[in-house]
Amino acid sequence: EKFLTTARHMIDKRLEPLSVPNEVLIFLMTMEVKRKNTVVLSGEGADELFWGYDRIFKWANRTNNLDVDEFDNYYCYGSNKDNEVLDFALEGLPGETPLEKLGYYFQIFHLQGLLRRLDNSTMLCSVEARVPFVDHRLVEMIAGTSFDWKMGHSFKEPLKRIFKEIIPNEIINRKKIGFPVPLDEIFDLPISNESSMDRWLLFNLENFRNFNNY
């Protein structure tokens, strides 16, 4: 109940639907941070600049054809997907291989969404989130490096090399951990054709319309 109440509060204050469920978790986490701090550091941008989405980039590295439907299965959630938008975004990107094109996609499009999500969630709490990985000097330096240098033998390899003397090996090489939200439990969904992400999108639209008298 706290999750849904918080989500409604955020939609009301922002006057727009939320993008993904973990926006609510970021907001709640920031509320706790606000007890002692008004400025935080965030790691947004590291996965986009240093290719940290292992599952997607591994697929892109082994395919010769950037099939939008297949990419969509790795990238998007829910059953009601509009691949025309995704196809349009990918079409004009530079890059000769699927791997290169997706590298640009995540930096140009995906990262913008993450930064907006972070900014919206933290500013609602009057907390400033700083993102050192998207400092323009670092972005410009990475832009001039080769795709081989960024990927190497594993993903985010440059970061691992840089920090290997500072951060313990078990942290550097641990399995990637997501930030999931148990939507099935939150919405108490029965077994049906409706996915939890479909229900989340419908919840957003219903509350957005209610707050804006649509």
Could you tell me what each predicted segment is?
Residues 50-75:
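A mobile, often basic/glycine-rich helix-loop segment
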Residues 1-13, 80-89:
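A conserved beta-strand->alpha-helix junction
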Residues 7-12, 56-58, 186-188:
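Short low-complexity, flexible loop/linker segments enriched in glycine and/or proline
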Residues 46-47, 139:
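Short, glycine-/Ser/Thr-/acidic-enriched flexible segments
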Residues 39-41, 66-214:
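Adenosyl-5′-phosphate
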Residues 2-6, 48-52, 57, 180:
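Short catalytic/ligand-binding loop motif for oxyanion handling, primarily in non-cytosolic enzymes
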Residues 47-48, 122:
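Glycine-rich nucleotide phosphate-binding loop and flanking beta-alpha elements
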Residues 1-9, 18-43, 111, 163:
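ATP-dependent adenylation/nucleotidyltransferase module used to activate substrates
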